[in-house]
Amino acid sequence: MGLFKIILVCFIAGIGAGLGTGFAGLSAASVVGPLLSTFLDVSPYQAIGVGLISDVLASSISAYTYHKSGNLDIKNSLPLLLSVLVMTITGSVVASYVPAKAMGSTMQIMLIILGLRFILVPIKTTKAQMNAVSKKEMLIKSVLGGIVVGFICGFVGAGGGMMLLFVLTSLLGYQMHMAVGTSVFIMAFTALTGGISHIAFGGIPDFTVLMFCCLFTLLWAQIASKIANKVDTRTLNIVVGIVLILTGIVVLVFNNL
């Protein structure tokens, strides 16, 4: 494959993946995977691996940006993180035995529905309301939510970003900025675990493709996360909703080409 084509596809994938990560806490793999498979003939399993490795850097820099703005809850998210990590490995192993065609089918419809939800019924929870939730209740919900999210992360290869955002806002009652910041923090670890597992079972991907995807995704994630931390909750709800809907539509189209 030509270098120009690789750079162009990775740049476009990086824009979508980076904006999705920085604004909405989405996994880079949900965008990178279908684009690499469609235009660069990378196997779906390896394409997801590239997306997850790109996700590690993008999520890490985004999490740092949210942390600087006080929008990252590390302590209370640890039970969720640990349960997600355990199930990510399980999901990734199971996915290695699934036909490539099945791997191309993700959760685009759910992305669109969740996007509409944030626009039509925005999250209005404040940090004070979030902190008033019982620690025991949050622990139980975190572990249960983590089991589901982790398996999805490993199996679908989407980093569980969409499900993490849903669990944090709807199940655990997080404030919107805090939910996105905590989501990308957890995703940095889940994507690393999932990425290593995908490479271990699916082989090492093309280094040039991996390098450019990581570079462009990191760049756009940094830009998006800085903007996200400067807008109010209502605006962030709308932005997140739009990003989710567009991502769902774009990935749905490419998966059916």
Predicted segment positions?
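Transmembrane helix boundary and interhelical junction motifs in multipass membrane proteins
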Residues: F23-V32, G157-V167
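Short, structured loop/turn "capping" segments at alpha-beta junctions
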Residues: T126, A158-M163, Y174-M178
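Transmembrane helix-bundle signature of multi-pass membrane transporters/permeases
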Residues: G18, I48-V56, L85, V180-A191, ...
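Juxtamembrane transmembrane-helix boundary motif
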Residues: M1-L19, G33-F39, P44, T65-F151, ...
